Amino acid sequence: RTGQPGRDGCRVPIPWSGSAPPFGFGPGTGQPWIPQPDAWKTLTVQAQQDDPDSTLSFYRRALAARRSLPADEVSSVAADGDVLTVRRGALSVVVNCGSSPIPLPAGELLLASGPLDGAPAGHLPADTAVWVHA
């Protein structure tokens, strides 16, 4: 071994179904060698399937939105303090990585990674991303 930390902490099997480890990962009685926390029962695909506020539902909405948009090239990527903005044609993805709300970009809101009502009107809350179509 190299003595360097491994990547095992970020390479845990996807929790598919059930209410206990291994959450539907793998056939039979085998167990993954990377442990899965018991708390993951709420994060299985099965548990998120019908929840409109789940991470799975968010990713499905993001994929549907992306398929509906033109396949333009990325025209710019900008980091300004705690804000990351990626532009692709008329689409802007703005990520507020900071701890304070920022003004929302103008345009049609296509997708938000979280509720926007936790910030003043017209602002993007902290730790939230939006897709906006100009």
Named regions from a protein language model:
Residues R1-L91:
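Loop/helix patches that line or flank the sugar-binding groove of alpha-linked glycan CAZymes
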Residues S92-N96:
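Buried hydrophobic-core signal for structured, non-transmembrane domains
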